[in-house]
């Protein structure tokens, strides 16, 4: 708690049963899982969409794949009316093929190595940079506003140990905070 403070108590529903797998690839799959859970009276509180909710699997773009999610806002509303919260997976890495890669590089919102460059091919978001935090909050804010109940923040442990963060600290210090 000395580093990051005490967390607030999570909402009660977050302690319930989560239905997840790698991955539900469509609105139809998510709705089908929810329907079967309720039909079979299986207590559950969260439907989690892992890597496949993006247009390209594992390519975090903070948008539901339009060809597989006809109306994500309505899906979220409908799932909520059935007693489900919805969780979405994401990761803080952006490959050169990701649509946000050029913007993140241009704006300098990434962790650097000792030479001030990308530590490896992907951009890793630098959450010690207030501009990065604002960018990230805007992306997630759109999803929360739509009705998403939780975000699975994955792969923080992969941050480069030899990186230099905007706050001047090394990756060894910032690793997995």
Description of each model-found segment:
Residues 1-45, 76-78, 85-86:
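Carbohydrate-recognition beta-sandwich/jelly-roll modules
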Residues 43-177:
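Aromatic- and carboxylate-enriched substrate-binding clefts and catalytic-loop regions
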């Amino acid at each position: 708690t000395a580093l990051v403070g005490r967390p607030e108590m999570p909402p009660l529903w977050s302690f319930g049963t989560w239905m997840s797998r790698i991955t539900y690839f469509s609105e139809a799959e998510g709705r089908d899982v929810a329907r079967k859970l309720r039909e079979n009276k299986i207590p559950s509180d969260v439907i989690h969409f892992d890597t496949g909710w993006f247009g390209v699997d594992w390519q975090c773009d903070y948008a539901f794949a339009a060809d597989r999610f006809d109306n994500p806002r309505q899906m979220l509303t409908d799932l909520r009316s059935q007693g489900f919260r919805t969780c979405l997976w994401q990761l803080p890495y952006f490959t050169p093929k990701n649509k946000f890669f050029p913007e993140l590089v241009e704006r300098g919102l990434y962790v650097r190595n000792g030479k001030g460059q990308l530590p490896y091919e992907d951009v890793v978001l630098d959450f010690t940079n207030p501009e990065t935090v604002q960018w990230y909050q805007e992306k997630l804010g759109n999803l929360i506003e739509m009705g998403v109940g939780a975000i699975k923040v994955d792969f923080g442990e992969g941050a480069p140990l030899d990186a230099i963060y905007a706050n001047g600290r090394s990756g060894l210090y910032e690793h997995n905070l």
